[in-house]
Amino acid sequence: ERDATETIFHFVQDMNERSFLSPKEDIMSDYIRLDKRSFIVKPLVSESPIQEVNGINVPRIEKLLVDIQCDRDFFYLQGQESLYMMQNAFANYNVNIGMLLRYASRRNIKPQIEKYIKEFV
């Protein structure tokens, strides 16, 4: 929820975790490294696939896979790296294809996601 974004950011920061509040492209590419754990706190897109874990709503793998493909904030993960992440997700997690396609359609990248699914499934 948008109102809780800042509160969640400060909560994560208070746990001494690397956290970023709605970072822009330059911050993402300069300070967020794939080999270090970092938390990116952003408001959710409406109707985003989420799940409750320990009483907290968190994004599902389907949301992350779609957002990496279309969100400019994740441009540094696009291309070959995103293909690798998609392949790993299908190999290691129970990805709900219907949910993935529904959210991809909402974000206007359904054909691209369908192409990836054909490669990995």
What residue ranges belong to the model's regions?
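Internal, conserved structured core segments that host functional sites
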Residues: 1-17
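Hydrophobic alpha-helical interaction segments
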Residues: 13-121
